[in-house]
Amino acid sequence: LKLNQSMPNFAVYLFSGLVLINLFNEAFSNSTKAVVDNSALVKKVYLPRELFPVASSIIAVVNFLPQLIVLLVVCGFLGWHPSFVQVLCIVLGVLIIVILSLGLGLLFGAINVALRDAQNIVDMILLFSTWLSPILYNVKLVEEALGPIGLVIYNLNPVTGAVGLLHYGVWAPTTAQTPEIMALMGSDVLRFGLIALMVSLILLVIGQLVFSRLEKSFAQNL
């Protein structure tokens, strides 16, 4: 695609997306396996079972923070000059990923106790997560390929919304932020970011409800 020839600071664009998708992949995968991996504790010690996927998500965030710090230090050398709103977008993008991965982790983690094949579904989702978000390419290319309606559907992916927010907060302030450059991220980054937050919260509620319903049978299934 030769994106490095059409986008300023493409390395920042790429890395800012990768660190966020790595957070999602690690938190989602580990949360899904958390109950099964701690089966001895689940069967012998009474603890809130949600503790295991939550702890897995916290560990993923701890692993993510040094990567984010390195990224921001590099951006500082490239003239990073974010506005207050752009800084908030970084926080919101990370928050969306944490909420989303925890919600999905609770959902698939509960199912995985009874049906171990659920982990294979998660692995399939993670396999495509990088390609279904604007990390290796920009949103303008998606619009050209899918058209306006296809772009809207594409942007409804909450991971896409979160990555867009991080690009807006991290990558955009290292550029001149001209209309042509900002168009590479799409014109509705903030709106789709808020939609991503709502979708993630809904999935968190669904995940918690399913987890609470199935946890009564955890001990016998493990």
Predicted regions and their residues:
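Alpha-helical transmembrane segments and their short interhelical loops
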Residues: 1-3, 49, 55-125, 129, ...
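Intracellular alpha-helical coupling/juxtamembrane segments of multi-pass membrane proteins
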Residues: 28-48, 58, 114-128, 135, ...
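A cytosolic-side transmembrane-helix exit/cap motif
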Residues: 29-35, 107-112, 140-145
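Short hydrophobic, aromatic-rich alpha-helical segments embedded in or entering the lipid bilayer
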Residues: 133-185, 189
